[in-house]
A protein has these predicted regions:
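Short intrinsically disordered, low-complexity coil segments enriched in acidic
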Residues: 1-14, 74, 139, 164-169
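Divalent-cation
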Residues: 1-51
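Alpha-helical transmembrane segments of integral membrane proteins, especially early/N-terminal helices
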Residues: 27-32, 70-71, 108-117
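A short, charged helix-loop
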Residues: 38-59, 84, 89-93
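A short, ordered amphipathic alpha-helix with a cationic face
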Residues: 51, 74-76, 113
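Well-ordered alpha/beta subsegment
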Residues: 55-83, 102
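Membrane-associated alpha-helical segments
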Residues: 87, 94-169
């Protein structure tokens, strides 16, 4: 069997507690165990929104992972706008409290970068298909997940660089 654990940040408290989830994958099935109703909510969303909910294990995992990565670009865009506002404040010498706002944002970005790195590794492990649980066609789903997580990680790294520039402003 394949086994993996995921620790997914909660977007209302990125540096706080995470949704903890374990996945057990065998040739026949996928078992998901978590410490909350998070996976149940994901599955309900998939049932409501996806036409191809899980015709095979690869497609199911793709839908499942992309469901919890769904809003990440939105969150990163929001963080970027916050940084742009801070930069504007700094350029107008309204620096009161902006350093206090910047540090938690940088911590959140560092947390997200680490999380996206873990997601890239998770997708690569599935892509390797060591046990032969997935057909060749299904492996492309994991490549897509890896690409998405990699883009999110790169966007996060860019925002960290931007935060550093704002800090120095």
């Amino acid at each position: 069997y394949l086994y993996g654990t995921l620790a997914i940040p909660r977007f209302l408290d990125i540096t706080g507690s995470r949704y903890q989830m374990s996945l057990f994958i065998t040739r026949q099935l996928i078992v998901i165990a978590d410490d909350s109703d998070f996976s149940i909510r994901l599955l309900q969303n998939i049932r409501m929104r996806k036409v191809h909910q899980g015709v095979n294990k690869g497609r199911f995992l793709f839908n499942f992972v992309t469901e919890f990565l769904e809003r990440d670009y939105e969150i990163l865009d929001s963080m970027e706008h916050t940084l742009m506002s801070m930069e504007e404040e700094a350029s107008q010498r309204e620096t009161e409290n902006y350093q206090e706002k910047l540090m938690p944002l940088r911590r959140e970005l560092l947390t997200l970068r680490s999380y996206y790195n873990e997601m890239v590794d998770f997708a690569k492990n599935l892509e390797e298909n060591e046990n032969g649980y997935f057909r060749k066609k299904q492996i492309s789903y994991f490549d897509t997940i890896e690409d998405r997580a990699d883009r999110l990680m790169n966007k996060t790294a860019q925002l960290l660089e931007y935060a550093e520039q704002v800090k120095d402003a």
